[in-house]
Design a protein with these regions (language model features):
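Hydrophobic alpha-helical transmembrane segments of multi-pass integral membrane proteins
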Residues: 1-393
Length: 393
């Protein structure tokens, strides 16, 4: 079975509707990666002056779709799979899952079609309530109420999305900014919590006599400080103490990811990509803390969080989950090593270089390497995601 279970871009495509919609990670991870490519291609064309009729203003579409399109698809796929593991309950699957996926897809395509703006808003806003319904029932049946935190996060995402649409519809002007930044903070907080759960766990399972050890005081402080920092960013983002809070959070995150470090993880791409993504979140808040002194654009720290933090963590988690949950060994396909490095190049071009060198070709380079990274994921993982498990039959 090892020979057939080893995944590569040359693997046979054995499409099965029942397999594709058996668990949430399969369709959502696949579409998230496809959309990551499409999203960045459209944005690169927009930056070059090739515009498209859109329900959203151009820059708002870019930020909204990164968070409520791409990242939401990844989080949905993760939760619709992980909640089943945590609770032992059967999760949304089959036609019900297909309908939820179709709703997400409609939210991505309707903004470009000649339909009433209210229809676009209603369709896009319907997604999170249905996702909440899908994950709440098994959590309540299981009784482990600590997992209800993810229901709360989904509710906050729904609220932030509502603010964006109320602004676009001119019902509540000037609220889109709050909705986008609020949603980004929620996403980062979700990543901090999930990363804090799984990164040390994955590392300990993969590395014999793992040397990483959590620091108790850091573990107790990091999430409360993160919540305070994010709430303050919605209230007084330009106050001096806001930069101080970002600096404190960056320090705690650096200590946290440093406490997990074992140099042997550098030889395991499925581990270093997750540690690296967490480190990029720390870097993002460090850059945020230094903005007044470095005289940098706020977009520098935002893209450290999105391209670096969200990009690396989502690509790393999708790559790992899609192996383990399709019955394959946790051995990263060789081409995905290249995908991870492409994402690092995209990060360097968009964050580190553009901080000091404002050259249009660097935007193109960043977009190209982002698209290459997620395009390689699609080409490599589509056989696994649309086919029955490799260890069945």
């Amino acid at each position: 079975m090892a020979s057939t279970s080893q995944l590569s871009y040359r693997s046979n495509l054995n499409f099965s509707y029942s397999a594709l919609f058996s668990l949430g990670f399969r369709p959502f991870f696949l579409l998230a990666a496809v959309f990551a490519v499409v999203l960045m291609l459209i944005w690169a064309l927009e930056l070059r002056g090739i515009t498209f009729a859109n329900y959203y203003p151009s820059i708002l579409w870019h930020s909204h779709e990164l968070i409520f399109g791409f990242t939401t698809a990844v989080i949905s796929g993760f939760l619709l799979t992980a909640v089943g593991n945590w609770t032992g309950k059967v999760m949304l699957h089959g036609h019900g899952l297909a309908a939820l996926v179709l709703l997400w897809f409609a939210g991505r395509t309707l903004p470009f079609l000649p339909v009433e703006p209210l229809v676009v808003a209603v369709v896009d806003l319907a997604f999170y309530p249905l996702l909440i319904a899908a994950i709440t029932k098994p959590i309540l049946q299981n009784g482990k109420m600590k997992n209800m935190v993810f229901v709360i996060f989904c509710g906050l995402m729904a609220l932030m999305n509502l603010l964006v649409h109320l602004d676009v519809l001119n019902i509540a002007p000037n609220m889109a900014h709050l909705g986008i930044y609020g949603a980004l903070n929620v996403v980062v907080l979700v990543m901090l919590i999930i990363g804090g759960r799984v990164i040390p766990f994955f590392s300990e399972r993969a590395i014999p006599d793992y040397k990483g050890r959590s620091i108790t005081v850091v573990e107790k402080l990091v999430l409360p400080v993160a919540v305070i920092t994010f709430l303050n960013d919605l209230w007084q983002p330009l106050a001096l103490w806001a930069y101080g809070l970002s600096g404190l959070l960056a320090l705690l995150l650096l200590l946290r990811v440093g406490s997990w470090f074992d140099r042997r993880l550098l030889s395991n791409p499925l581990l270093w990509v997750l540690h690296g993504g967490y480190l990029m979140i720390a870097l993002g808040f460090l850059l945020r803390a230094l903005l007044p002194w470095l005289q940098l654009s706020p977009f520098i720290y935002i893209h450290a969080l999105t391209v670096g933090g969200i990009g690396l963590l989502t690509l790393g988690m999708m790559s790992r989950v899609a192996l383990g949950h399709t019955g394959r060994p946790l051995k990263l396909p060789q081409v995905m090593h290249l995908a991870f490095y492409c994402l690092l190049v995209a990060l360097v071009c968009r964050v580190l270089v553009l901080a000091w060198i404002q050259k249009p070709f660097l935007y193109d380079m960043s977009a190209m390497f982002w698209m290459l990274a997620f395009g390689l994921f699609v080409l490599t993982y589509i056989p696994a995601l649309v086919s029955p498990r490799a260890d069945k039959g």
